[in-house]
Regions:
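Active-site lining segments that contact anionic ligands and/or coordinate catalytic metals
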Residues: 286-288, 330, 338, 355-358, ...
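Histidine-centered active-site microenvironments of extracellular/periplasmic hydrolases
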Residues: 339-372
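Metal-dependent active-site segment of extracytoplasmic phospho-/sulfohydrolases and closely related
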Residues: 323-349
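Feature for exported/extracytoplasmic and membrane-associated proteins, marking the mature portion
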Residues: 2-326, 371-436
Length: 436
């Protein structure tokens, strides 16, 4: 039997149409406010063509591993990061917006990260000493593993949902989690379901049309329910309409910003920005958002496709950061990338096949910036970090990244952190230190 929560989630996923005025001024979030924005790069982003070694020795190692798709060294956008060694790094040439964010201290990179159950070595994985995450290299499974944050389990909950189980207030009438990219297990909690919003479904029709639609809808919904299920649906419908109207009103209270480019990810982040700026109306002190960009399964024509995708990512993140900084919210909002997995170092010609570890980005005004986080691997094929055929073994786990963010969001006890990330105890370093 469908639950009340499932009904509410389904109703809340309908396009937002406000029947209320839009002229009220919005209030900025309170001083305790913090938000996490998760950007999922669907398909498996090639993080080693996004963040590339730039010194001669490490670049030669990189180019030897992937001669058909290596970026020209002269094209890389240089980064001034402390790597703890003679390694220097550069960005893909399409990411000038993100280069500027690195230069201004609003962006950091986490090297060679991915899904793990415990710290793992090549030898340990080969002889069974170290546990292998299930269904590696499978899109659906690894998207779930990243979002679940508890590799090896079958829980339907996500780590961000569990985080909000700990942090959200019992008085919240609207869930503090939002997906702008459809269903996301990441946001599933024990106590709440995510609000599903389509950026393209924001109210665009005039007041008369809104009024006529609402009148017709009210007439249909006023019919008396004849069964217990009908009565339950009626209650859920009323809650859902109220939530929908509150969200639409909150979004509409914040003016649109012209600097967001006409890109799908940017549209999603534009809506996120408007919701964040109106969070005080919703009564939230903590919020989590999920957005996504697809197309990263680059088995062919990778150089051209990846250039377009990374340009879209760079432009969208730069616009979102500009919006947060202009509103004085830069240090209250942290944005992170996720992806199914990385790509194999060895190419299949003009593309790459499914890998394991990748490099990831974190953006915001609360960063301890200027250094590389995580451990840069050896890119030698069949070397110590190569599980097989150029699939890099992660040296930093999803749990370590998430726990660092959870601590910044306000998680203070070991019990709470253990509920959110049950595998975290397997890792000696549980706070990577990239947030203040």
């Amino acid at each position: 039997m469908i639950s009340r929560r499932q009904l509410l989630a389904a109703m809340a996923s309908t396009p937002l149409v406000s029947m209320m005025g839009t002229g009220s001024a919005h209030a900025l979030p309170n001083n305790d406010y913090k938000a996490l924005v998760c950007v999922f790069l669907f398909g498996g982003n090639d993080g080693f063509n996004m963040l590339v070694p730039n010194d001669n020795a490490h670049y030669d190692e990189y180019a030897a591993a992937r001669p058909d798709i290596a970026l020209p060294q002269a094209s890389l956008l240089p980064l001034s990061l402390n790597t703890g060694s003679d390694l220097t790094l550069g960005l893909h040439p399409s990411m000038t917006g993100i280069q500027n964010l690195f230069d201004s201290g609003k962006m950091i990179a986490i090297a060679n990260s991915g899904v793990l159950i415990e710290p793992s070595t090549k030898a340990g994985l080969q002889d069974g000493t170290h546990a292998m995450p299930p269904f590696l290299f499978s899109h659906n499974s690894q998207q779930t593993e990243w979002q679940r944050g508890w590799s090896g389990s079958t829980t339907p909950l996500g780590w961000a949902g569990r985080l909000m189980d700990v942090l959200s207030s019992d008085t919240d009438t609207i869930s503090p989690t939002f997906s702008l990219n459809g269903y996301a297990q990441l946001l599933n909690g024990s106590d709440h379901s995510a609000n599903l919003i389509k950026a393209s479904s924001l109210p665009k029709v005039n007041a008369v049309s809104n009024s006529l639609r609402r009148k017709s809808f009210d007439q249909v919904m006023s019919l008396s329910p004849l069964t217990a299920f009908g009565r339950e649906f009626d209650r859920v419908k009323d809650d859902s309409i109220s939530i929908r109207d509150q969200l639409a009103t909150a979004i509409e209270s914040v003016p649109e910003e012209a600097h967001f480019p006409d890109i799908s990810l940017s549209h999603q982040l534009h809506t996120v920005a408007r919701l964040i700026k109106s969070s005080d109306q919703l009564g939230h002190q903590k919020q989590i958002y999920f957005v996504g960009l697809g197309g990263f399964d680059t088995h062919a024509n990778q150089l051209d496709t990846h250039t377009q995708l990374l340009s879209a990512l760079s432009q969208s993140l730069a616009a979102f950061n500009q919006s947060m900084e202009a509103s004085g919210l830069g240090d209250k909002v942290t944005t992170m990338t996720m992806s199914d997995f990385g790509r194999r170092l060895a190419s299949n010609g003009a593309g790459t096949d499914h890998g394991w570890a990748s490099n990831h980005l974190v953006m915001g005004g609360a960063l301890n910036s200027g250094q590389l986080y995580g451990q840069w691997p050896s890119l030698i094929l069949d070397g110590e970090n190569d599980f097989n055929k150029g699939r890099m073994i992660p040296t930093t786990s999803v749990e370590q990244i998430g726990a660092t963010i959870a601590k910044w969001m306000g998680v203070r006890t070991d019990d709470a952190m253990g509920y959110i990330f049950p595998n975290l105890a397997n890792f000696s370093v549980q706070d990577l230190g990239f947030l203040k």
